[in-house]
Amino acid sequence: DIEIDKLSEEEKEFCKQALLNYKSFQNIIWHGDMYRLQDPYENPIASIQYVNHEKTSSVVFSFLVSQRFQTFYSKEPILFKGLDQKKIYKIEEVNLFRGEITEIDQEATYTGEYLMKFGFNPIVSDKRKSVVLKINEITL
């Protein structure tokens, strides 16, 4: 639970931005298809993906559910689901704390086939306990 009265101004700004981010992809969550990508009972990380029906936009939530005995968690890529194999996508990390720099190459592009066959590593770790990725189709 978040105790708002105990948050710093910077933390309050982060919460406001997180709500704006959520609003930008809430229709994908409410009306899209949901895929469980990683089982938290078998992995220290849980990952859930939502994809809109047109397969043009997606959002992936990956978060640490267990910290036992490990300092780096997502060594293996996560195989995405529900994308169009032929479409080309760009991945953007959202919900970064002010001043934090993503470890993800946000300029790279991937085919849906690549993301579903070979996957993508969101780089979840003890320092990055939660990663939110927006995946959008691009036209070249």
Descriptions of predicted regions:
Residues 1-100:
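Active-site-proximal substrate-binding groove within the catalytic cores of carbohydrate-active enzymes
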Residues 66-140:
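C-terminal beta-sandwich/jelly-roll accessory domains of carbohydrate-active enzymes
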